[in-house]
Amino acid sequence: MYQDFESELSWAMRHMPRTRAAVAALPDLHGVRLACNMHLDLKMAPLVAGLLDKGAAIFLTTCNPTTVQNDVVAWLERRGAQAYAWRDMNAGEWSESFDRALAWRPTHLCEMGADLTTRLHQSPNGPQIVAGLEATGSGISRLNGVAPRYPIFNWDDLPVKEGLHNRHMVGLTAWHTFFQTTHLTLHEKRVLVIGYGLVGQGTAAAARAYGGQVMVAEIDPARALQARYDGWQVVDLASAVAQADVIATATGAKNVLSAQHLQQAQDGVFILNVGHVAEEIDVGFLKSLPHHEPMPYVNAYQLNE
């Protein structure tokens, strides 16, 4: 555990009063076995710790191996949670984590992406789930093809989730991460935002606020029209890729930025995904290319010799 973890944890606890208040208002949770498939980063620690304090038994898996903070997982395990998750676990290990979570026989599920529910409905011998929670639009889309055998509360549609988290926080934190990782700003850069749902809207607005020259690509005619009415330059994805200095995907759909698109991008373009599904970008194609890490957490891929 790195030296400053306890300080960062204390900071997060202090500055998440609404989370603390919400957990404090819950009834006694003894007897509840909750399997959580979510981002296991610092901001989740106060929530999970509070649920443990209320008596819930908890099993932790991750919805995205690249966002796991191992120190957070270790701290929650010491508090009593069980977990099968670590940063950059491979595809086989990640898939196994879902099987382990369900073999633990949970009574309730809390998910970001519906991985556990999807896996459960592929097996006739899974645990008897009382109810579930789903936090993402991507997960809700997956559930539409599953026909769950138990009630699932869609908290992606809550006004506070839509209007605050999706519309504002995702875009802000995405660009903050970009600045901290690259040591660059968006000034004098043409930024292409792909997708104009709530996350895309917030990503575009934050990019403009931070100095970017923003273009929006959106295939849904109604959303594209909304983007025009909001004052954005709406562009065709295939032609705009070659013009962009920074490309941000925000759709929740797979393979939006394909190998063909990537081959059209200009030299030095930055590509990032702010949607839930990492495969919005054809990562498999990128990994097949020669690449190196010029900065921590920045991968450079060589398309042509």
Regions of interest found by a model, annotated:
Residues 1-23, 29, 60-189:
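Glycine/serine-rich phosphate-binding loop and adjoining beta1-alpha1 elements at the start
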Residues 33-35, 192:
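Conserved beta-strand elements of the Class I
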Residues 37-44, 64-68, 114-116, 198-199:
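Gly/Ser/Thr-rich loops at beta-strand to alpha-helix junctions
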Residues 41-55, 61, 172, 176-254:
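Glycine-rich phosphate/diphosphate-binding loop of Rossmann-like nucleotide-binding domains
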Residues 48, 73, 98, 203-204, ...:
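Generic hydrophobic/aromatic pocket-lining and core-packing "Φ" positions
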Residues 54-57, 81, 125-129, 148-150, ...:
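A short helix->loop->beta-strand "cap" motif at the edges of active sites that frequently abuts
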Residues 62, 108-112, 125-138, 263-303:
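ADP-ribose/adenylate-binding Rossmann-like module
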Residues 102-110, 232-280:
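Rossmann-like NAD(P)-binding element
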